[in-house]
UniProtKB/Swiss-Prot annotation:
This is Protein aq_1444. Residues 1-191 form the AMMECR1 domain. PANTHER family: AMME SYNDROME CANDIDATE GENE 1 PROTEIN, AMMECR1 HOMOLOG. SUPFAM superfamilies: AMMECR1-like. InterPro entries: AMMECR1, AMMECR1_dom_sf, AMMECR1_domain, AMMECR1_N, AmmeMemoSam_A, Uncharacterised_MJ0810. Pfam families: AMMECR1. PROSITE patterns: AMMECR1.
Length: 195
């Protein structure tokens, strides 16, 4: 797998949206990235590295090529926390792609949850009723959170009280992610070490 192809595919999709052009993905690329996989696209300003958009497909329900196109378009234009990306910003943002493993529910006593979470490896999904929140593995590393803080902030992301992870009705899932980011816009793509 050449992750640069996925970053370029995401950029291509967003550029074509700016231009009002159809997104045509070559059959060879569709075939190469046909495996279903969860993926998130994160856009960051350059050189500040401030979040500019982040949306993805957490479950492996789409082929990787499609999930990359979809998440790139969503991160650029549909993240409700930000105004849609403007054409003049296109060469001032970094593309980051996170490839996800399928989530696994942690079925341990609630008080043991923090010791099951490995910062720098795991991302979290908290689910209670209809409410769900997800934070990628890189988030607690960037903010210096402990496993308990990671659980609390994921609860808040779900719109729930920060200690909801202790409730017996709450489900906690972990997943792993490989993070790849451009060093500079349109530049070399490298794997991000989360440890």
């Amino acid at each position: 797998m050449d992750i640069r192809e996925l970053v370029h595919l995401g950029r291509y999709a967003v550029w074509n949206a700016f231009e009002g052009k159809e997104i045509k993905v070559p059959e060879a690329l569709k075939e190469k990235y046909s495996r279903n996989m969860g993926v998130f696209t994160t856009l960051k300003t350059y050189p500040e590295h401030n979040l500019r958009g982040c949306i993805g497909v957490p479950l492996p329900v789409y082929p990787l090529w499609y999930a990359t196109v979809y998440s790139s378009l969503q991160a650029a234009f549909q993240d409700p926390r930000f105004y849609p990306l403007k054409k003049e910003e296109f060469d001032k943002v970094l593309w980051e792609i996170t490839l996800l493993t399928p989530p696994e529910e942690l079925k341990v006593p609630k008080e043991e949850l923090p010791e099951q979470i490995e910062i720098g490896k795991h991302g979290l999904i908290i689910e209670k009723g209809e409410q769900k929140g997800l934070l990628l593995p890189q988030v607690p590393v960037e903010y210096g959170w402990s496993p308990v803080e990671f659980l609390e902030y994921t609860c808040l992301k779900a719109g729930l009280p920060k200690d909801c992870w202790k409730d017996k009705e709450t489900k906690v899932y972990v997943f792993s992610g490989e993070v790849y980011q451009e060093k500079e816009p349109f530049g070399e793509v490298e794997r991000v070490n989360l440890k």
